[in-house]
């Protein structure tokens, strides 16, 4: 699963996920892309589950690019622990997703195969997504 190798600080504040993606919002590597329409967080497990679903569907052909990386640690306190006594330990990592962000890209497959693979992947994600075809000349 994806997670940072090392961080300057172990814990991070919650913050607010506002605005829309101004970077990473176009199909750059492949011919087809899965773009986020909604806003939210994707955990490393969700990113991996969607990747597996796509990889299984396209079998040997094609290439997949993951355009997002979970670099924000989410901390949790253990069950049945009283409030206070500091912040909990980092449990997992998430990628903050803004509308317009390209999540995955694919190349080397037909459009209908890519469309179906992205449909299977989108079912694993808690966001609304759209299938994007690379524009010629872009």
UniProtKB/Swiss-Prot annotation:
Keywords: Ribonucleoprotein, Ribosomal protein, RNA-binding, rRNA-binding, tRNA-binding. It comes from the Bacteria. CDD domains: Ribosomal_L16_L10e. GO terms for molecular function: rRNA binding; structural constituent of ribosome; tRNA binding. InterPro entries: Ribosomal_uL16 (IPR047873), Ribosomal_uL16_bact-type (IPR000114), Ribosomal_uL16_CS (IPR020798), Ribosomal_uL16_dom (IPR016180), Ribosomal_uL16_sf (IPR036920). GO terms for biological process: translation. GO terms for cellular component: cytosolic large ribosomal subunit. Residues 1-24 are annotated as: Disordered. Residues 1-13 have a biased composition (Basic residues). Belongs to the universal ribosomal protein uL16 family. Part of the 50S ribosomal subunit. Binds 23S rRNA and is also seen to make contacts with the A and possibly P site tRNAs. This is Large ribosomal subunit protein uL16. It comes from Burkholderia ambifaria (strain MC40-6). The lineage of its organism: Bacteria, Pseudomonadati, Pseudomonadota, Betaproteobacteria, Burkholderiales. The gene is rplP.
């Amino acid at each position: 699963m994806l997670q940072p190798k090392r961080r300057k600080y172990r814990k991070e504040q919650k913050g607010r996920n506002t605005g829309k993606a101004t970077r990473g919002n176009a199909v750059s590597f492949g011919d087809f892309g899965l773009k986020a329409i909604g806003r939210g967080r994707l955990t490393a497990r969700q990113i991996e589950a969607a990747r597996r679903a796509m990889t299984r569907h396209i079998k040997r052909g094609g290439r997949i690019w993951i355009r997002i990386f979970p670099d924000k640690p989410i901390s949790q306190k253990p069950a049945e622990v009283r409030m206070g006594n500091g912040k909990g330990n980092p449990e997992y990592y998430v990628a903050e997703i803004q509308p317009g962000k390209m999540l995955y890209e694919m190349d080397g497959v037909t459009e209908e195969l890519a469309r179906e693979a992205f449909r299977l992947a989108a079912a694993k994600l808690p966001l609304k997504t759209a299938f994007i075809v690379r524009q010629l000349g872009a």
